[in-house]
Amino acid sequence: MSPLAWLLSLPVRAYRLIFSPWVGFNCRYDPTCSAYAMEALRKHGGVKGGWLTLRRILRCHPWGGTGVDDVPD
């Protein structure tokens, strides 16, 4: 993982550790948004992985889609 990707993964790791147990595991997509973010950052680095993560988080809302949404290759 690149240094930028590692830095961008810190808020995701904090969310998983602190907030996720409180808000529950109710993501509309599979894999969950945090799992998607970690995979995108690991696979594509900080810039593209960060962009993919941002797009995914913006799609994850009550009126958004559902289903399987894997990280593109």
From Swiss-Prot:
Pfam families assigned: YidD
Localization per Swiss-Prot or TrEMBL: Cell inner membrane
Keywords, comma-separated and alphabetical: Cell inner membrane, Cell membrane, Membrane
This protein's GO CC annotations: plasma membrane
Transmembrane recorded as keyword: no
Membrane topology field: Peripheral membrane protein
Transmembrane domains' residue ranges: none
Disulfide bonds: none
Domain of life: Bacteria
Record NCBIfam families: membrane protein insertion efficiency factor YidD
Family recorded in the similarity comment: Belongs to the UPF0161 family.
Role summary: Could be involved in insertion of integral membrane proteins into the membrane.
Protein name as catalogued: Putative membrane protein insertion efficiency factor
